[in-house]
Curated annotation (Swiss-Prot):
Protein name according to UniProt: Cyclic pyranopterin monophosphate synthase
Tagged with keyword RNA-binding: no
Disulfide bond residue pairs: none
Gene responsible for this protein: moaC
InterPro entries recorded: MoaC, MoaC_bact/euk, MoaC_sf, MoCo_biosynth_MoaA/MoaC, Mopterin_CF_biosynth-C_dom
Length: 166
């Protein structure tokens, strides 16, 4: 039985009329300023949080390393996610915000480009890898660290318009 995917083509842009995956052709799109912000959190025991805050981790600079990893990951998104376009990124900002109420860290990433397609995946990848790196750097202190609530907060630019989480 052959399935007709043509009616889905407009909504499912990464599928062709036969249902096979494809990379979207953005060659006719106009370059515009695109920006996306993503967030996540890393929860840990109070003792682990305090050790990181004091700089007492056996692996060294936990927060600095996680920040650099997030920046590097945003730049490598097209290598990690098969149908993402490689983009020239003009700005990547990563914040690891101490949150004693979790306890742990809120992670935020903002990515900006002037391109034909958006940077949502780059922002989400930056947060994800920063969180994974924080875990890796702190796992000698605690194995039960939890990575939570990775999500897109906002995006601007492009034909689909702006988005902001409610």
């Amino acid at each position: 039985m052959t399935r007709d995917f043509s009616k889905f083509e407009q909504n499912l842009t990464h599928l062709d009329s036969e249902g096979a995956v494809k990379m979207v052709d953005v060659s006719t799109k106009v370059q515009t300023i695109r920006q996306a912000e993503a967030a996540g959190q890393v929860r840990m025991l109070p003792e682990t949080f305090e050790a990181i805050q004091r700089g007492n981790s056996p692996k060294g600079d936990v927060l600095g390393t996680a920040k650099l990893a997030g920046i590097m990951a945003a730049k490598q998104t097209a290598q990690l996610i098969p149908l993402c376009h490689p983009l020239p990124l003009q700005k990547i900002d990563i914040e690891l915000i101490p949150d004693p109420h979790l306890p742990g860290y809120q992670i935020r990433a903002m990515v900006k480009t002037k391109a034909e397609t958006g940077v949502e995946m780059e922002a989400l990848t930056a947060v994800s890898v920063a969180a994974l790196t924080l875990y890796d750097m702190a796992k000698a202190l605690e194995k039960s660290i939890s990575i939570e609530l990775i999500r897109l907060l906002s995006k601007s630019g492009g034909k689909s318009g702006d988005y902001m989480v409610k």
